[in-house]
């Protein structure tokens, strides 16, 4: 992709100089383009971040194994926030995790089954720390699950898997989940937190789990302040990232709720918006000895 200069509407609000230590970016709809591809310049730009002493930390609803598979060696030394904040790691070190109870996971599975029986075209993923499980195995649903879960196992009955280490129950609705099955799912398991993470996905996690909470854990682990943190997002499961970063960027393609929460805007994910803005932030970043 040809490098394009940032338009004045993106540049004008930015501080002239920043002390930047941590850049956190969502994946789908944010870093990844409209065809599901990682930016070709990611290795180059992340190398420049590291040379400047800035940590690069992807934060996604995706599974940890999927993040590592999709991003490859570029994140070998990066902290990763996975499963919409329910898990944060750095290498083999677990920095943070939040799980839901076996009873909550079972109720979520049962509710999704009831919705499917009543005509909703939904499928369920039960995400644990090392593997994710599905019981629906038709090609259409399997293709969607495999986009986000590299370590994926098909079972006959989700109720038979160990439910005591569940990070997230994710439900995929082939229709618009925000205006469809999400309300019934949220009402059926009120003790869990629900977040629409895209047009078709809803995540059911611990009420304590969020990308923002995982970000706070990373900041504590590395001694980084909110004013030294930049975040990029596009959808509602990114929302509380903005509470913990002074440099909060909404993609121009973001949900209205994200645009309202963010102090700044970046070009769309289809326009290499994250990397173009990161390069500008690097130019404005205060040099440190």
Model-derived features with residue positions:
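N-terminal glycine-/serine-/threonine-rich phosphate-binding loop
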Residues: 9-52, 56
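Short, structured coil segments at secondary-structure junctions
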Residues: 73-76, 83-84, 188-190, 244-245, ...
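Conserved acidic, metal-coordinating active-site core of Asp-based
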Residues: 119-232, 236-241
């Amino acid at each position: 992709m040809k490098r394009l200069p940032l338009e004045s509407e993106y540049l004008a609000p930015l501080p002239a100089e920043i002390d930047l230590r941590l850049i956190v970016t969502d994946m789908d709809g944010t870093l990844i383009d409209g065809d599901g591809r990682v930016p070709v310049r990611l290795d180059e730009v992340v190398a420049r971040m590291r040379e400047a002493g800035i940590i690069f930390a992807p934060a996604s609803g995706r599974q940890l194994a999927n993040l590592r598979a999709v991003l490859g060696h570029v994140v070998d030394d990066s902290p990763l926030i996975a499963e919409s904040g329910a898990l944060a790691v750095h290498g083999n070190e677990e920095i943070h995790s939040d799980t839901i109870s076996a009873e909550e996971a079972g109720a979520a599975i049962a509710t999704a089954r009831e919705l499917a029986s009543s005509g909703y075209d939904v499928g369920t993923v039960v995400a644990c720390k090392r593997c994710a499980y599905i019981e629906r195995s038709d090609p259409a649903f399997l293709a969607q699950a495999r986009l986000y879960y590299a370590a994926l196992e098909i079972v006959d009955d989700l109720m038979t898997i160990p439910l005591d280490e569940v990070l997230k129950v994710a439900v995929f609705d082939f229709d618009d989940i925000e205006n469809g099955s999400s309300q019934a799912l949220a009402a059926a398991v009120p003790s869990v937190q629900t977040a629409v993470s895209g047009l078709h996905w809803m995540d059911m996690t611990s009420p304590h789990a969020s990308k923002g909470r995982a970000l706070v854990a990373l900041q504590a682990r590395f001694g980084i302040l909110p004013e030294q943190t930049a975040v990029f997002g596009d959808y509602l499961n990114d929302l509380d990232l903005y509470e913990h970063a002074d440099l909060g960027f909404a993609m121009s393609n973001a949900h209205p709720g994200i645009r309202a929460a963010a102090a700044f805007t970046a070009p769309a994910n289809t326009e290499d918006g994250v990397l173009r803005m990161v390069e500008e932030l690097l130019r404005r970043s205060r040099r440190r000895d």
